[in-house]
Design a protein with these regions (language model features):
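Small-residue-enriched hydrophobic alpha-helices in membranes
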Residues: 1-32, 39-148
Length: 148
């Protein structure tokens, strides 16, 4: 996750309720822990994003305690805005690809989250493919502009 860069539109995020912001962060936290644990680097990442989102320290502790997919599914139901749902799926795909390895657990979680928000699997796959294409394009840019 070291090279991860969040690319969300912060003006858009500012318009979300605190519960919706917390739902985003819970989804990020659970996705980061898909391997069975949250590393210190992943915890720091969640805390930094929470600070950027303006989420209280008290809620951050709640976010970091998530240990099952069902809690995430319930939390994301607070996201009742289609654009916010698609944004969350995009950012989850970016996070899942941050280590260049998309696990089955990550794929299943992204699917469950999307479906809970009313996003069909075809749209989730479309977003995931777009993220992959974009990552490839960024890597090619490093080569072209001799930044390797």
């Amino acid at each position: 996750m070291a090279d991860l860069k969040m690319e969300m539109d912060m003006d858009f995020i500012a318009g979300l309720s605190e519960d919706q912001k917390v739902a985003f962060l819970k989804a990020f936290s659970r996705l980061a822990a898909a391997d069975g644990r949250l590393d210190p680097e992943e915890i720091e990442f969640i805390k930094e994003v929470a600070l950027t989102f303006g989420v209280s320290e008290r809620r951050v502790e709640e976010i970091l305690k998530i240990d099952n997919d069902e809690e995430i599914i319930e939390a994301v139901k607070a996201i009742n805005n289609r654009r916010a749902a698609l944004e969350l799926i995009k950012e989850m795909c970016v996070l899942a690809h941050a280590d260049d390895e998309l696990s089955d657990e990550e794929t299943v979680l992204i699917g469950k989250v999307g479906l809970a928000m009313g996003v069909d699997l075809e749209k989730i796959e479309q977003i995931s493919n777009w993220v992959i294409d974009r990552l490839i394009w960024l890597e090619e840019a490093k080569i072209i502009f001799e930044e390797v």
